Design a protein with these regions (language model features):
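Aromatic-rich, lipid-facing transmembrane alpha helices and their immediate juxtamembrane interface loops
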Residues: 1-170
């Protein structure tokens, strides 16, 4: 096997390892943040922001862990394959990734309900049913939280840059 193929395999393995680490690390944190966001929304408005009709608890669901994992994959891919390479600033990252995740939340809710007839989340009094426009702020915050949780962790698995040579003055 030639060196370029081995190098490519190592890079792919490093990216896959990084992605898996992020999914395992960030997904449960996002899920707990969702619980807090729903509780905050409930305290401010008097009703939960969203409910889970199939969950016995109604205000949270373990099924949403899969969606949170998907959002971590999306944010990670945007980070590695777009934002990092183009030097996209944090505010733009928040707006782009958060808005895409918001649209993904609506799409997943629509597909779960209309295609599979297994509604996942229903937003209270929302014209879009599966997400509300106010959720954009939650999603933008989640992208910022992702960045704060993974700063410097994003490059795990990559070779460290060579240390600068020190000059001794003895």
């Amino acid at each position: 096997m030639n060196a370029s193929i081995r190098g490519t395999q190592r890079r792919v393995a490093g990216h896959v390892g990084s992605l898996l680490f992020h999914v395992v690390y960030v997904t449960p944190i996002f899920w707990f943040v969702e619980l807090l966001q729903n509780q905050l929304y409930w305290k401010l408005t008097g009703a939960p922001g969203w409910t889970y009709p199939r969950s016995p608890y109604h205000w949270f669901s373990f099924e949403s862990l899969g969606l949170w994992g998907g959002s971590v994959v999306l944010i990670w891919c945007l980070h590695f394959f777009w934002f990092q390479r183009r030097g996209v600033g944090m505010v733009k990252r928040m707006i782009i990734a958060g808005t895409l995740c918001w649209a993904g939340e609506w799409l997943s809710g629509f597909v779960a309900d209309q295609v599979f007839h297994r509604p996942l989340q229903i937003w209270t009094n929302a014209p879009l049913v599966y997400v509300q426009f106010s959720a954009l702020f939650f999603w933008w915050w989640d992208v910022l939280l992702y960045q704060l949780l993974t700063v410097d962790i994003a490059s795990l698995g990559r070779a460290a840059p060579p240390a600068p040579e020190s000059s001794s003055s003895t």
